[in-house]
Amino acid sequence: MNNTIKTDVLIAGCGCSGLYMAMNLPADKKILMITKSDCESSDSYLAQGGMCMLKCEEDYDSYFEDTMKAGHYENDKKSVEIMIRSSADVVKDLVDCGARFAREADGSLAYTREGAHSSNRIIFHEDITGKEITSHLLEKVRTLPNVTIMEYTRLLDIISRDNRCLGAVIRTGNGEIIKVEASAVVLATGGIGGLYRHSTNFRHLTGDAIAIAIKHGVELKDINYVQIHPTTFYSDKEEDRSFLISESVRGEGAKLYDKNGKRFVNELLPRDLLTEEIRKQMAKDNTDFVWEDLRTIPEEELKTHFPNIVQYCIDKGYDPSKECIPVVPAQHYFMGGIKVDHESRTTMDNLYAIGETACNGVHGRNRLASNSLLESLVFAKRAALDITKNAVVKPTQDEITYFDTFDAEKYADESKIDGEYAELVNKKIEEADKAYEESQKKNYA
C-alpha cells in the first residue's frame, strides 16, 4: 500500500522558476514543492553575470534583435516579445522581495554588458546574481503557509491517464515512495548537465523531467540545442562541476589569448560562435585551454564586481589581478526541453513545465547571455496565472480508480531508473542531432 499526499499544485524543483511560481499562485492553493537535493543546490543559485531587462523603450528593438540573432533567428518571436515586455515587472517583484542590484551614484540601476549584446542592459549583484535573486525568493516562499517544501525528494514519474496528468510518484530522503495527487503538476527540474562529464551544472541535474516526458509521449522541442559556455576555469584535476568564468568579465573588457599571448578572437561573439573559435585555437595550439586576461579590468572594479571569481582563482593558484587564467568551454545550458506554449502548458493536460526544463522557443538555437533567469521568471508567473484562472476539473471515476490502484513500488530500484532515464534522454538527443545533420545536408546539397 502506497502512502498518498493530496495537494492542489505539485512543483518539482526549487530553482528560481519554481519558487517564483509558488509566490504567484493564490494563497488558497495548497502547494507542495520538492527538490532532488537541498533548496540551495539549483543552477539558479550559480548564475553569475546578471539578468537582462528592458531599461527603456528605445532599447526594445535592439534587445529583440540581439536575442533573435544569438538564437540564429530560430526563436519564437512571441515568446521573445513576452519576455522582454515583462522584464520590468519581474525586476520590481524581485526588488520588493529584497533582492539587491548594483546601483549608480544617483540610485538608478547599474547595467553591465555581455557577449552578443549591443548595449548595457544587464542588472547584477556582484558576480552572484542568481544567488541574490533565488535566495530572496526562497526566503519569501518559506513564509507562505500554503507552501510545503520537501528537500532531498525526487520526482520518479508522473501518473497520467488518457493524456491527463493526475499526479506523481516521489521518493523522499528517507527512501519512502509516495503518490502525490495534484490538480496540476509543474516540471521545473532544471537542465541536463549531470549527463555530461564537464558541465557548470550541479551533478544531480540529469534531465529527469525530460525522460519522464519522453516516457509519457509529451512533446519535446529542440532537444539537441545544448549550449556550451566558452569560458570555465581549466583544471587538470577532475571536479564535480566546472566553475564558470562569467561572460560579464568579457563584457567589462577581459581578453582571450592563445598560447603565445596573442589575442585571437572577438570576445563578445555569441556563445556558440566563441566556443567554436576557442576550440579551433586549442586544436591549433595543441593545448587543453586558452588564456583569459582579466587585468584589463581596473583592479578595484575586478575585486568588487567579481569577488567570488577572483577568490576562486586565487584558491586555485592564480591571481587574476596579476596574471592570466586558463579557461576552457564546458556544457552550460539546455535551450531545448519539454515543448510548452506561452502559458507554459505542455501537450498533456494539467502538466506544466518551466525554467530550463521547458522550451517555449525564446532562446532559439543559442541563448543570449543573461536571458535565462528572466525567461524562467517570466514564464513561471504566466504558468501560475494560467492555473489560477482555470477552474479545476475534477477527476473522473475511472481516473480516481486508476490513481488509487497505481502501484508506485515498481520504482523501488532507483539506480535502474537512473540508467533508464539517462538512456532515454541521450538517445533522444542523438536522434535529434542526426535529424538536424540530415536536414543541413539537404539544405546545402
Segments predicted by a language model, with ranges:
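Glycine- and aromatic-enriched mobile tails/lids
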Residues: M1-T7, N24, C39-E40, L46-M53, ...
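N-terminal Rossmann-like FAD-binding beta1-loop-alpha1 element of flavoenzymes
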Residues: V9-M33
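Conserved N-terminal glycine-rich FAD pyrophosphate-binding loop of Rossmann-like flavoproteins
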Residues: S37-M68, H72, P230, D240-R241
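Short beta-strand to alpha-helix junction loop
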Residues: K77-A88, R121-E139, M150, T200-G207, ...
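Conserved redox-cofactor binding core of oxidoreductases
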Residues: V95-E176, A188, T232-D236, L256
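A glycine-rich dinucleotide-binding beta-alpha-beta segment and adjacent secondary-structure elements
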Residues: M150-E151, L156-C165, I170-R171, H305-C359, ...
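Glycine-rich loop(s) and the adjacent beta-strand/alpha-helix scaffold that form part
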Residues: A184-K237, F243, L373, L377
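An anion/pyrophosphate-binding glycine-rich loop and adjacent beta-alpha core
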Residues: I212, V218-Y318, D386
